[in-house]
Amino acid sequence: MEGYHKPDQQKLQALKDTANRLRISSIQATTAAGSGHPTSCCSAAEIMAVLFFHTMRYKALDPRNPHNDRFVLSKGHAAPILYAVWAEAGFLPEAELLNLRKISSDLDGHPVPKQAFTDVATGSLGQGLGAACGMAYTGKYFDKASYRVYCMLGDGEVSEGSVWEAMAFAGIYKLDNLVAIFDINRLGQSDPAPLQHQVDVYQKRCEAFGWHAIIVDGHSVEELCKAFGQAKHQPTAIIAKTFKGRGITGIEDKEAWHGKPLPKNMAEQIIQEIYSQVQSKKKILATPPQEDAPSVDIANIRMPTPPNYKVGDKIATRKAYGLALAKLGHASDRIIALDGDTKNSTFSELFKKEHPDRFIECYIAEQNMVSIAVGCATRDRTVPFCSTFAAFFTRAFDQIRMAAISESNINLCGSHCGVSIGEDGPSQMALEDLAMFRSVPMSTVFYPSDGVATEKAVELAANTKGICFIRTSRPENAIIYSNNEDFQVGQAKVVLKSKDDQVTVIGAGVTLHEALAAAEMLKKEKIGVRVLDPFTIKPLDKKLILDCARATKGRILTVEDHYYEGGIGEAVSAVVVGEPGVTVTRLAVSQVPRSGKPAELLKMFGIDKDAIVQAVKGLVTKG
């Protein structure tokens, strides 16, 4: 076989010994913790031994080195064996393994990036392969480097549709630097996996997605060495037939042992049995990588020129997003764009036109698109911007949630928000997205109201840690800011004010423009309103909101193209709660909408200029 050199018997025995030490460590750690998944670890022991101590190239004492091969443990519940590997490699003290799952230890129940050897958090199953695809795409097309990417999946998680989205992606883009290892141990959490040990069916499925699929005995280190040596020329799936709980007498291949540690007495006996098979304590040193990944700096990426808009001209913020992203792409070759086959609606096609080699078409697979972005962003190799209709990000909420747990720096732009998209109807209208993104830990939620603000939001997002969401709209609205207006995260703007203002009206996007129109109407009736643009919904500018409220007799009116739950009104209410004399009145979409013209829908749901006028009058009349 091309490029394959069979290890000698001494090396094969050393790999067997390593696998058994990994088993012992996994059993010891989970028994000490009183929880965990030792049987899921034991099925993967030979796979992990061969991967880390024969196949992969990495610096054991520098796990995040950019030249290293990457590994993603998609079956994150097998974390103890991952920790055991890094102790075997010399990065972790072996005694630390016994602190598994303790609050004082970094060794959580599932992998998290506070561990230097973990790039992405896993444990919500079906997501690791998508992240691995992002890493492999980056390695092949952006870094053009030698490092390879390995991902181990359990057979239970292969029921997840997101796995097959990732399989399709890897096949389409011919990610020949990617290897997925399927640990086919037959048993799921509560029942056998649907295909049990039908490894030929797994092989056909993988081949249908454009993968080279190799069936192996997952407990044969020799077969595994050979299979990894054959992983060339296209994405490769190693379909490893294994047994859950391998090496644990009385438990191997038995149901009802998922997620259960061995009782102490049983563990001691089993450890003695396994240890009796270990012929040498000598450890195998990791093989260092080829150092050919380029140096990358993604800090302080700034627009090459200021915005170029004219006050009063009209542009949709979704188009302004595309223009801004294309411009930012000239500032750094590490700005990349991903889209879910909506690029002619989100206007990310403008980026593709100017930077075709940095645009990733993810097709209609939003869950995988987010995972790809997370993978691309690992080790600070790229700054990804994903775009689709904001409504369609809701199906990727688990991926977004896990991205936050992964401490990932990704930017998501959701277009076509609210009822203002008009005739397409409720399936296309994002009305829950603010609630969703506000709930994500350490997220930043941008809601720009004109082209200038949108361009600034894109630039700020590129330099803001965590999950950034930019909410853009379909209707064209007037430019209201000058090109030199300064924008910052958490800094709102007073767009209109006078000394006699009686109500503070807070709107964003389409509703900010409705508020300005309402202000003109109210002015004719000698009722002054202060109009505030929050710019970021998270974090909100609490100080400015309260200053405006106090200047307008404590009256705040929020108006938003979003459902009441979780939107601007609730966000504003949260920051003013407990403030004496401040009240918040909310206008929002109250029920599932329908098709219609944008103006008709804004009126129907009481968030247009007329509704604002009536609400302001009601507040003023109340006194």
Swiss-Prot record:
Residues where Phosphotyrosine is found: 275
Gene3D superfamilies for this protein: 3.40.50.920, 3.40.50.970
Family matches, as PROSITE patterns: TRANSKETOLASE_1, TRANSKETOLASE_2
GO cellular component, one term: peroxisome
Keyword annotations from UniProtKB, A to Z: Acetylation, Calcium, Isopeptide bond, Magnesium, Metal-binding, Phosphoprotein, Thiamine pyrophosphate, Transferase, Ubl conjugation
Co-factor: note: Binds 1 Mg(2+) ion per subunit. Can also utilize other divalent metal cations, such as Ca(2+), Mn(2+) and Co(2+). Binds 1 thiamine pyrophosphate per subunit.
Cross-link (Glycyl lysine isopeptide (Lys-Gly) (interchain with G-Cter in SUMO2)): 352
Chain positions recorded as substrate binding sites: 37, 258, 318, 345, 416, 424, 474
BP-aspect Gene Ontology terms: glyceraldehyde-3-phosphate biosynthetic process; pentose-phosphate shunt; pentose-phosphate shunt, non-oxidative branch; regulation of growth; xylulose 5-phosphate biosynthetic process
Keyword Transferase carried by entry: yes
Cofactor(s) this protein requires: Mg(2+); Ca(2+); Mn(2+); Co(2+)
Catalytic activity reported: D-sedoheptulose 7-phosphate + D-glyceraldehyde 3-phosphate = aldehydo-D-ribose 5-phosphate + D-xylulose 5-phosphate
Record-marked site positions (Important for catalytic activity): 37, 258
Amino-acid positions noted as binding Mg(2+) in the UniProt annotation, renumbered to this chain: 155, 185, 187
Known role: Catalyzes the transfer of a two-carbon ketol group from a ketose donor to an aldose acceptor, via a covalent intermediate with the cofactor thiamine pyrophosphate.
UniProt-listed NCBIfam families: PRK05899.2-5 (NF004559)
Family in the record: Belongs to the transketolase family.
Entry protein name: Transketolase
